[in-house]
Amino acid sequence: MEKVLIWFCGTGTTKQDFLANVEISGFSAIVAIDGIGTAAMLTKTQALAKRANWGGSFVDMSETLGVLYDQVNGYDDRAGVVTLDSLFPLVDYLKTLKEYQLVVGGHSRGAAVGLTEFLAELYHLAVQNQAPGVWANAKTIRLVVVDPVQGQQDADKDTNAFNAILKDKTLAQILAELETKWFGGREVFDTLVYSARYDARSSFAFDSRWYRFITEQMGKQAGPAKRAKLVMAGFRHSAPVSKEDEISALYQGKGVAPIAFLQQLVSFDPNWEQSARLLSQIENGYLDQLAAGAKTDLISQLDKQTSLLSTALPALSAANRCKKRCRRITRKNRNTAGSTAISTGRRRFNASYQVTSD
């Protein structure tokens, strides 16, 4: 069966960056959409329309300033239109397929905004009683939602302001109603939320819409949310998609690593749950050592590369934070699926839900 991938890149990440870091194979079609805060996206949004405010028009006089402005402020309506317009050529291709497996994934703002807006647009069409068209031929739609950090988009805490995303509809409701209206109740959506295990930056918290999905809907509400899973790997926000942030030395000879794990999730590898548990064992072991003050080369590298200093912010080492918090990360249901409370150094999920990594 043909496999098709749609990927929404994170802030400052081009489709070339993504494909260079995460090797994707086995797909008949791949559409990777440039992230906000890239020259590629800026060129497309400028061609569509000028910014609505004077300050935005001023920064667009320089590509460098325009890119930086977008990295700080995130998606605007123009970027939303460009993102969705990028999918039209794919729709023409899907018309040629009788059946296919679809993966829709994204990282950071690409997950929090791009992927979410895509789902909301499908929902918007469904509630207007429009036919599903080519989407009806999807046997499975796997959502791979990687660290959906929204970055305080325009001072908002979530994605409610974006096109077709209704304030009174949760993600669980959107997915459930799509399955009912477009797929006759068939279990189509397979949702995997992939969180970085740790990031020292408090501003890199989950988008509140996805946070509520994890803590209030996942494993509890009927439909796709009941089947959804949370997995965790990596010690930096971009570890699942960036070789630079993966800290690959930690995983050398282990048979698993955050990027390779993402490849498994995207490619429908049936062994992904085994890899999730192994990553949990490996990373929780490092956190135990870090909390205990171990002085090995690997622990020193982990401490250095997870400190705020490594992100060009005032220094606050992961060791100092972990001495207070790592014990809570590692002591409960660390290797098996089940009900747990997870503290990650930047955010905490206090709820009962199914996880496969801790």
From Swiss-Prot:
GO BP terms: lipid catabolic process
Annotated keywords: Hydrolase, Lipid degradation, Lipid metabolism, Secreted
GO molecular function, one term: hydrolase activity
Keyword Transferase included in the entry's annotation: no
Major location category of this protein: secreted
GO terms for cellular component: extracellular region
EC number(s) stated in the UniProt entry for this protein: 3.1.-.-
Protein name in the entry: Extracellular phospholipase C
Taxonomic path: Bacteria, Pseudomonadati, Pseudomonadota, Gammaproteobacteria, Enterobacterales
Compartments (UniProt record): Secreted
Species annotation: Dickeya chrysanthemi (Pectobacterium chrysanthemi)
